């Protein structure tokens, strides 16, 4: 979900990559959101639910007959699954995205920002059994707001952090209060940090040698930090965690063995951690 602009990279942010097409995400822009229109072209205003069900069933039968002749077609299989999901979503999506059903106390807890609204919807989605929710943050419609390489990293990041703070805190408190936090892993981060050296003005260049991600709930330890950077804040030097280690740990917390979870693609079995990755057990409660 995006509170405003579509994240740069678009499908690369929520596509299925080499996983089956059914695992691709559904992009939702919640700015100026109307619960029955959060996903474009989801509703068919010309047919009743019963008529749509008949059409969907007929098309599914035709597609399955075609699939039998092909024996295997990942895109067609994904299309069959996606069509059924779309049918079900047009009746369930408006309900789960209608935050007006929340109490005034809950809405006040989260705040009025678009990002806070996204955090509240994320909680509602988790309650309804959605397995993965990705929420991106921008401000003033600027889709790469955190890219302050040439901007004011001090004032800019302070503004961005303030815009996120209440919604994030509310999400964690709300999940815990409803008994959902222990079974919901919350991960906050990006793909790199910011270097300690100047970019000419007040900006900072990309730094992938050492940066911070935080995790909450879902079986991780509370109230501690893991690892450390050098004296300049440039490179991780203590308890270093590679992105493959992080992914292996997340999968472990989800009950999946990253060494055994494979998908067949282009003639070979792929792992989400490639041939790398170790579970960081020190992070696990």
Positions of PLM-derived features:
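Ligand-binding pockets and gating/stacking loops
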Residues: 1-285
């Amino acid at each position: 979900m995006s509170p405003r602009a579509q994240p740069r990279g678009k499908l690369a942010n929520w596509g299925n990559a080499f996983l089956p097409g059914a695992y691709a995400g559904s992009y939702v822009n919640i700015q100026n959101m109307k619960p029955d229109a959060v996903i474009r072209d989801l509703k068919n205003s010309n047919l009743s639910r019963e008529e749509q069900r008949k059409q969907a069933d007929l098309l599914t039968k035709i597609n399955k007959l075609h699939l039998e002749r092909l024996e295997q077609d990942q895109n067609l299989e994904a299309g069959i699954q996606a069509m059924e999901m779309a049918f079900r979503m047009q009746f369930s999506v408006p309900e789960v995205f209608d935050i007006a059903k929340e109490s005034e106390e809950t809405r006040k807890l989260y705040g009025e920002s678009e990002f806070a609204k996204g955090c509240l919807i994320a909680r509602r989605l988790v309650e309804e059994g959605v397995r993965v929710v990705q929420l991106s943050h921008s401000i003033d419609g600027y889709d790469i707001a955190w890219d302050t390489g040439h901007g004011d990293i001090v004032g800019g990041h302070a503004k961005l952090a303030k815009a996120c703070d209440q919604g994030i805190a509310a999400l964690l408190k709300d999940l815990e209060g409803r008994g959902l936090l222990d079974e919901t892993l919350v991960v906050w981060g990006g793909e790199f940090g910011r270097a300690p050296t100047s970019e000419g003005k007040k900006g900072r260049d990309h730094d992938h040698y050492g940066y911070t991600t935080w995790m909450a709930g879902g079986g991780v330890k509370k109230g501690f930090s893991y690892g450390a950077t050098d004296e300049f804040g440039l490179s991780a030097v203590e308890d270093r965690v590679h992105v493959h280690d992080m992914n292996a740990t997340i999968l472990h917390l989800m009950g999946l063995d990253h060494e055994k979870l494979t998908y067949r693609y282009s003639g070979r079995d792929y792992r989400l951690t490639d041939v790398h990755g170790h579970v960081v057990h020190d992070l696990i409660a």
